[in-house]
A protein has these predicted regions:
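A conserved glycine-rich beta-strand in the N-terminal activation segment of trypsin-fold
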Residues: 152-214
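Structural boundary/hinge residues at secondary-structure and domain interfaces
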Residues: 30-147, 189-229, 266-293, 298-300, ...
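Sec/Tat signal peptide C-region and signal peptidase I cleavage site
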Residues: 24-30
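Bacterial N-terminal signal peptides
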Residues: 13-23
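Edge/loop elements at the starts and ends of beta-strands within beta-rich repeat scaffolds
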Residues: 42, 104-107, 156, 242-246
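A short, solvent-exposed beta-edge/loop patch
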Residues: 49, 146-178, 246, 291-310
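Bacterial N-terminal signal peptides that target proteins for export
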Residues: 2-15
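Internal helical hairpin/lid segments
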Residues: 232-259
């Protein structure tokens, strides 16, 4: 089961917004991770995507986006969760996907998902026993396989469960138990989180994640010499989407100096002009609705549209090429 590819698809689609340059504003709900969840996330985070599941369920635009980008593997997980006794429409409140490196000098990436809510743990465990599901024991925790999804799950407590491959879950438990450093010691990512975690959908990326994302966003414009010059200045990024009163997207890239931010802004504007030359009507409208600016060592991208325009955008060739 290629959960890493699933994460790439989700993160790309959520940031498609940025890439398409296509999602926030304040909201009644916020997708915030609990302290228990944060303490189990590995230090070497490359990207986190966190979603308020209640907001998603109540937004036609959010559900349309979900339908377009949800990979089959996660649909299998959803089915497996329901069969285990969980009701994702009732029990699930927040959902997060964590892409991380297995070491500070490694490019080997692994992914875990975190679900938060009020879970009927006793009922779920009773169902596992009834089905004679064999658990993998790691110290005081038990990892349970989730049917044909290829993923397994471990419950940190009654409100937090983590799913992924068994090797990744073992690493997460090592982090939770203090055997490996956690997200809490990653100052740059924690700073980025404080800028966005009051939003219903948000993502933060570290230096490597930011440089990879911006290379994808810029497309052919990333091949120019200026990009190589400023790439090393891209130290972090974060974006949010909000589905109340249409769709809104905000992306910020931290460069640390004004010259680098202005250069990336110019490259991004050039990429927008290039895309307008061949884009569909809905794509051109989306690009017209996008503003790009830089200030104080930071690049900012803002996009806002109506639900109906966003629906048309999801069907556009540019969107399809980015999520398939």
């Amino acid at each position: 089961m290629k959960l890493k590819n699933s994460m790439k698809k989700i993160s790309l689609s959520c940031s498609l917004a940025g890439v398409l340059l296509v999602g926030g504003a304040s909201s009644i709900h916020a997708a915030q991770l609990s302290s228990d969840a944060r303490s189990a996330i590995p230090h070497e985070v490359q990207q986190m995507v966190v979603i308020d599941y209640r907001i998603m369920q109540n937004s036609s635009s959010a559900m349309a986006l979900r339908g377009q980008v949800m990979p089959p593997e996660l649909k299998q997980l959803e089915d497996a969760l329901n069969k285990s006794g969980l009701n994702d429409n009732h029990d699930l409140e927040q959902l997060a996907f964590i892409l991380y490196r297995t070491g500070s000098g490694s490019d080997d990436l692994r992914t875990v998902g975190i679900a938060q809510g009020q879970f009927p743990i006793d009922d779920v465990l009773a169902n596992f026993r009834k089905q004679k599901v064999k658990a993998t024991v790691v110290r005081t925790s038990k990892i349970y396989p989730m049917g044909k999804s290829g993923m397994s799950v471990v419950f940190l407590d009654e409100s937090t469960m983590i799913f992924g491959g068994v090797p990744a879950l073992k690493e997460v438990l090592d982090v939770r138990d203090g055997l490996q450093p956690s997200l809490l010691t990653n100052g740059q990512v924690m700073d980025s989180m404080r800028s966005v975690d009051s939003e219903p959908l948000w993502s933060v990326l570290d230096e490597k994640g930011t440089q990879t994302m911006m290379k994808q966003v810029l497309g052919q414009a990333s091949s120019v010499a200026d990009f190589d010059t400023v790439k090393k200045h891209m130290v972090a990024s974060y974006y949010t989407m909000n589905f109340q009163h249409g769709v809104k997207f905000d992306l910020s890239v931290v460069t640390g100096d004004s010259f680098a931010a202005a250069t990336v802004s110019s490259l991004l504007n050039a990429a927008v002009l290039y895309q307008k030359m061949s884009g569909s009507d809905s794509e051109k409208q989306a690009l017209d609705d996008t503003t790009i600016s830089s200030k104080q060592g930071r690049l900012d991208v803002h996009f806002a549209t109506s639900d109906s325009q966003f629906s048309s955008l999801l069907k556009s060739p540019m969107f399809q090429s980015m999520v398939h």
